[in-house]
Amino acid sequence: ACASCHVLASATADGAALETRLDVSQEWLPEVPARNVPDLWNRDHNDVSTMLWDGRLQPVAASDQVGLVLPESLSATVFENLMALQSVRPIVIPAEMLGEPGAANALAPEARGAPIPEGVLARVVSRLFEVDARGQAEGESYRALFRESYGIGVADEVRPAHLGNALAHYIEIAFQSRDTPWDRYLAGDLSALSADQKRGALLFHGIGGCAVCYAGDIFSDFGFHSVGVPDIRENKDLGRFYATGMAEDRFLFRTPPLRNATL
């Protein structure tokens, strides 16, 4: 379940002081060091131009290309946005939800770097339409919802993009903050912020220089920066380098959005 890692009690992050490794063997762990789970708040916002701490999931920037970049062999077509793509990625990653290959997991790829079998997401779709021992559809409510939302109601018509788009719409509705004291203040309600909060805003947007990086509606430029703090761990996290392979991107990380940071 998504909520196993995106914990509601921790504002959809993991709430951990230190990152933890997933329970798979070393062979199937990615080269990227363990990281804390990113939260889901306001990820539908138009300012969100990348996903994950190193921006591995992003729109194609080249002018002669269209679509979205994925590090896995998963087609980006018909997914509505980055959040829709990211919603299904954990399902096809061995170190997250897919698991290691074995007798009980025939859907996992045979080796690291091998293409993800297309049957993985097809199997997820089919589970929504399976019948129980009495011949009754266990996912009847899902069938009704897919029929209502997309005009489809049988497994053969449901595509992985339908799953991703549905999850993204839920995240958009469930985890958004559009009516905060800050929003009301910007809209003209000068009483929405306390005197201390106003002084903090002046510092944040003024001499403190915070807004140089923490800018926009959700307080992030979504750029990649190094704050100069050394990584003391044995397995150092090279950040943006894992997405681009460029030496100059070593130790750069995406600016985390500060909207709702106190949750």
Task: Tell me what each language-model feature is.
Residues 1-263:
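Periplasmic c-type cytochrome electron-transfer domains
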